[in-house]
Structures are given as C-alpha cells and as structure tokens.
A protein has these predicted regions:
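Active-site metal-binding loops of divalent metal-dependent hydrolases
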Residues: 53, 82, 104-106
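Extended substrate/RNA-proximal surfaces in nucleic-acid metabolism proteins
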Residues: 1-77
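Short helix/loop capping segments that flank catalytic or ligand/cofactor-binding pockets
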Residues: 11-12, 58-59, 88-89, 110-112
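C-terminal functional module detector
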Residues: 4-7, 16-17, 36-44, 109-310
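Residue-level detector of structured alpha->beta connecting loops
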Residues: 45, 96-97
Length: 310
C-alpha cells in the first residue's frame, strides 16, 4: 500500500512501476522487490507498508516470516486487512513499533463493500503533509475494522467447497481437500505461526480498535433477503437518511431511536453492540456469515476434527 502526495506524483510513479501484466487479477503488479519498491517510493515522498499483511494470497506474511525480510528495513506502517485486527497483530513482537492502519480495498461499488474499514487520525490540517506527519508520529486515534471472523481468509478452508479444516490436518494432506479443491491457510493460523505471544502486547501508542460489520448485511440477515435486493437497499437508505452514517447507526445512535425508524433492525443493532451475534468464520475466499442463532457452531466443531468430515 502506497500513500501518495498528489495525482501528478501518482502518474509519475505509475509510469515507473508499469509492467506487462500490471492489470492481472485486478491488481497492479511490479517486478520490484519490497526493498526496491520502498527505496523507489521514498524518492517521491510517499509512505509505504504492506496491505492486508497476513492474507494467504498476496499478503506480505504469506511469503516472508519477517517484515524486514521483505523490505530490508522498516516501512511506515502495517495495514491489517479484513481478516485480522490489532489484537491478533500485536501477538507478533516485531510489529510493536509500527502504526496499524485499517484500509479495506473495494471490489464493487455496493455500499456494504465501500469503507468497510477506516482510521481516525488527528490532523493539523487537511493535507498530505499532515497525514504523513500523523502516521509517522503514530497519531492514529482509532482503527475501525471488520470483525475478523467475517473476513474471507480468516480461517483455513477449502477454496472450492469452503469447508473449514484443521490447519495441521490440511498440511498432512498437502493442502488438498477431499472434494478435490485446494485448502488455503487462514490468517488466524498464519499469525499463530509467527506469533511471539499467546496474548497481545499493545504498545502505549496503540489506539483503540472498534469492530464493525456492514449494516446492509445485518439488514439482509434480519429480513432474509439478499444484500443487494431493493428491500435491503431501501431499508439501508432509510436508516442512513435518518441517522447520517453507518457508524452512527452501529455505534452511536440510541436503540430506542433506531427502533422508531425500523423496529425489526434495532434488536440486531443491539445484539451487535452486545457481541451476541453468531458468526460463521470466513475462509477459503468466502466471507463469514452472521446469524442470530447457533446453527453454525456445529459446522465449525465438525469440520475442525478430520479431513474425512469435509
């Protein structure tokens, strides 16, 4: 992830980084190593750090056991990704001096995919130099991020049938599922491999981490309708019109006021705040799912025992 001062610099840097398959898989690709890339972007006064650092497809910790093995020296920050949070990342000792960012990427224009994660940063003014100074000085006041279990690579799972599997059993079976699909290591297990502590050790500068989930998905679960249907999108828009933002609805607005607008949604918001919503962990490329019963706890218990349960 590169934070760039302005559009002109972005164009210059893009031309320098251009490669034959730059649009492969919807992501820019480059021939440069992490260390070379770091040195290059510094010439343009940019900030750089690994995006979704722990994810199994393209994350930095997929290929390296240390951030210094990738970049040669310390980058400016670590972006955690949807499938991890501060509590997971702060079990890795080498990350204690890095500011954490939560900046979700977007693969569609739907509101529930935009701005799923963001940072609260104290700025002197609305400028790149102020943003740079805040990140360098670790003046991040809060990270807002998806509940990690909802991330589509949180748990080790098959990329074809999406069943969860014990990572050690997956290794024994050469990461092959009985359905013929490939098992992809989850962020949860990858962090356990490189972790130095059983419990997180937060440095003094580490800000609070506020867990979120997309409001449209809560509405979808309550009304048992697809998240992009007119029903769900209409209910979502009505709440936004009345309260302003998803954060105000999920975190700040009173349950009583929400109930006046949509009495069916207010219990779901209350359950979210009380952490009583049940989550099917995501894995293998499939997002986690939310429910208001325990129907998915059995699935996890069964699939984490043996490969024969797939």
């Amino acid at each position: 992830m590169i934070i760039i001062p302005d559009i002109g610099t972005a164009r210059e840097l893009s031309e320098k980084l251009v490669s034959k398959n730059k649009e492969s898989d919807g992501r820019p690709r480059t021939k440069y190593s992490g260390a070379e890339l770091l040195e290059m972007v510094k010439e343009y006064d940019c900030l750089i750090g690994p995006a979704h650092a722990f994810t199994p497809w393209t994350g930095m910790y997929k290929s390296f056991d240390s951030i210094y093995d990738c970049y040669g020296k310390a980058p400016d920050f670590v972006e955690l990704g949807l499938s991890a949070d501060t509590f997971m990342a702060d079990t890795v000792a080498e990350l204690k001096d890095f500011p954490f960012l939560t900046n979700s990427d977007a693969h569609s224009p739907w509101p529930h995919r935009l701005g799923r994660e963001f940072n609260q940063i104290e700025l002197e003014d609305m400028s790149y130099s102020s943003i740079k100074k805040a990140i360098k000085n670790k003046d991040i006041k809060a990270n807002y991020g998806l509940v990690p279990n909802l991330g589509k690579y949180h748990m080790t799972a098959c990329t074809k049938c999406y069943k969860l599997v014990d990572p050690l059993i997956a290794k024994e079976n050469k990461m092959k599922c009985s359905c013929g699909g490939t098992i992809k290591k989850g962020v949860d297990f990858r962090i356990s491999e490189i972790a130095d502590y059983d419990e997180p050790k937060h440095p003094d500068f580490r800000p609070k981490y506020v867990h979120l989930m997309p409001l449209a998905e809560l509405i979808s679960t309550v009304y048992d309708k697809g998240v992009t249907t007119k029903t769900v999108q209409g209910k979502w828009q009505n709440l936004i019109d009345n309260f302003g933002t998803e954060i105000d609805i999920l975190i700040n607005a009173s349950i009583e006021e929400i109930a006046k607008t949509d009495p069916s949604i207010s219990p779901a918001i209350e359950a979210f705040r009380n952490k009583t919503i049940h989550i099917t962990p995501g894995g293998g490329g499939k997002y986690g799912e939310i429910s208001f019963d325990k129907k998915l706890e059995k699935r996890e218990a069964e699939t984490l025992t043996t490969l024969d349960n797939f």
